[in-house]
Amino acid sequence: MVHWADYIADKIIRERGEKEKYVVESGITPSGYVHVGNFRELFTAYIVGHALRDKGYEVRHIHMWDDYDRFRKVPRNVPQEWKDYLGMPISEVPDPWGCHESYAEHFMRKFEEEVEKLGIEVDFLYASELYKRGEYSEEIRLAFEKRDKIMEILNKYREIAKQPPLPENWWPAMVYCPEHRREAEIIEWDGGWKVKYKCPEGHEGWVDIRSGNVKLRWRVDWPMRWSHFGVDFEPAGKDHLVAGSSYDTGKEIIKEVYGKEAPLSLMYEFVGIKGQKGKMSGSKGNVILLSDLYEVLEPGLVRFIYARHRPNKEIKIDLGLGILNLYDEFDKVERIYFGVEGGKGDDEELRRTYELSMPKKPERLVAQAPFRFLAVLVQLPHLTEEDIINVLIKQGHIPRDLSKEDVERVKLRINLARNWVKKYAPEDVKFSILEKPPEVEVSEDVREAMNEVAEWLENHEEFSVEEFNNILFEVAKRRGISSREWFSTLYRLFIGKERGPRLASFLASLDRSFVIKRLRLEG
């Protein structure tokens, strides 16, 4: 099957016509931390642009920061004194943490740094700068000239939604009072560049559209941007794409006011965290950021989460055991891509998903240290980073001859596994090696089996996990010991739990003499 990004790219070429350069856009209001749900907007635009580039076209990806929006409410994690700034542009509200020029910049810079780590090329633009330097002046004036047409379009959809029509004194723009920097009521337009306003403080005056104090309202601003930048594609959340939404009105406004066609759009679903109720909200603070994912995932896996899901499918990120499954799935797709492992009928789509997931496509299969096993090894206190690498080599998980690139990836995964165990691993995955054998009842048959395994280990300095696994099963089977009794006894002896990691590979990772002593209940 064709990957969904390639399908949309082909549709753009077909419906927008052949061009040397296409423009894709994404946009976010930095009213709080920009979370993994917000990122889906940017990545959807990016991956479609990526598909267009792969077809030989030049692409400009604009990401619009709507930092000229009003500061509407004080988030939980912000001092309540910030209520004094309500109604001001968020680009002019001070940073509560004192590390950036403004409230908006605090959140924008963090997200920009996070996106850069994913190898995503994007042109970040700032609405506050564009308005203040008069970039949109002509389009704003045109919106005033076409005010009646805009009201007609909006009222048509308001009537369908059984909402009252816009008041007669409605204008397609708002004014930020030059003195108090709050939204002011527009009283009059002189038919040219001047607008008369009255601010909540009672102050009245005239302001020039070109001064940067006049800002279009959202339902006009969005189609104006499409026209100004020649946007060919912009994804949107379903709240913007339902019947009568801002996309529907925007399609008509761009045509009737600016004489152009609306870009193609694509609805994307929400991104949530498994086990968390409700939507993430940057202003509420119940969010997971890209930087949180970077603590446990390689950059390619972060991109893979979004690339593998069609945009109309909700994503639930499982930071618990789901992380182990995600690594397993990604590693399998990577092996299929490099022809190391066979797949099924969807090989083409899987290979394309891998291509679109990688910030920089590797020329060969770089060593894959199984994350599931690393989550076990990082809990063994006697193993250093180099020891872990040696265990992986000895047990056949990675090759003996490691390149610099191989070593870097393995070490990265070791650190990511440590972070995962510390922050997200369920309690039944965590364990610690008991310093002394616990007092447990051991039947005579089990004791004999343990002694036989200890003797086998004494006689085998080198062995494979498969050989060791066979011995563990054979000694128990020969004595009629049930797997449940046998394995639970061994787990209790080493980690004090009924269950644990895969036993053969786990015990083979421990010091051999320690395992022998513990099996003999000597220490």
Curated annotation (Swiss-Prot):
GO terms for cellular component: cytoplasm. Zn(2+) 2 binds at C177, H180, C199, H203. One of its GO terms (molecular function) is metal ion binding. A motif ('KMSKS' region) lies at residues 279-283. InterPro entries: aa-tRNA-synth_I_cd-bd, aa-tRNA-synth_I_codon-bd_sub2, aa-tRNA-synth_I_CS, aa_tRNA-synth_I_cd-bd_sf, Lys-tRNA-ligase, Lys-tRNA-ligase_SC_fold, Rossmann-like_a/b/a_fold. Pfam families: Anticodon_2, tRNA-synt_1f. Its main location: cytoplasm. Zn(2+) 1 binds at D95, C99, H100, H106. It comes from the Archaea. Coiled coil: none annotated. Its cofactor is Zn(2+). Keywords: Aminoacyl-tRNA synthetase, ATP-binding, Cytoplasm, Ligase, Metal-binding, Nucleotide-binding, Protein biosynthesis, Zinc. A motif ('HIGH' region) lies at residues 30-38. One of its GO terms (biological process) is lysyl-tRNA aminoacylation. Binds 2 Zn(2+) ions per subunit. It is found in: Cytoplasm. The keyword 4Fe-4S does not apply. It is an enzyme of class 6 (ligase). Its EC number is 6.1.1.6. It catalyses: tRNA(Lys) + L-lysine + ATP = L-lysyl-tRNA(Lys) + AMP + diphosphate. Belongs to the class-I aminoacyl-tRNA synthetase family. This is Lysine--tRNA ligase. It comes from Pyrococcus horikoshii (strain ATCC 700860 / DSM 12428 / JCM 9974 / NBRC 100139 / OT-3).
